[in-house]
A protein has these predicted regions:
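Catalytic phosphate/metal-binding cores of nucleic-acid and nucleotide-processing enzymes, i.e., regions
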Residues: 1-133
């Protein structure tokens, strides 16, 4: 029996999500290290939140900032790529190809509404809407 589930995962301990411009200007070893951190975050959040295995999923991705400049809407793609790899590692999806990732929608970044909203200086918020396997 399959159904639709939705999970909101908030990574607020790694600081500002890595942007495309930042990754472009980093040494390739630094990019690899950064992606591993986001990958581990996706893995841990999936396990802690008990996200089940899914046959496929759609993703809404949004960055939240306490202060500082607001990047382009899709600038956080490098952070999300690592995060998505972590979801695959956790067994949420069998892979990150188009066969399993139905869509990725980047929502405009926003400033914090209150100091209680997140623990860190910034957060990557990933909403997963998926069909359970």
């Amino acid at each position: 029996m399959s159904g639709t589930n939705q999970f909101v995962l908030v990574c607020d301990w790694l600081g500002r999500p890595t942007t495309a411009n930042k990754a472009h200007n980093m040494h390739h070893h630094a990019v690899s290290h950064d992606r591993r951190q986001w990958r581990e975050a996706g893995l841990q959040l999936a396990l802690v939140n008990k996200v089940p295995a899914m046959a496929g999923a759609s993703f809404d991705v949004q960055a939240i900032y306490r202060r500082g400049p607001m990047p382009d809407t899709d600038a956080v793609a490098p952070a999300f790529k690592g995060f998505l790899d972590g979801l695959v590692d956790a067994g949420v999806l069998p892979g990150d190809t188009g066969a399993f990732v139905r869509s990725v929608r980047y929502l405009a970044p926003r400033k914090l509404a209150s100091d209680q909203e997140i623990a860190g200086v910034a957060a990557l918020v990933v909403t997963i809407t998926g069909e359970t396997a």
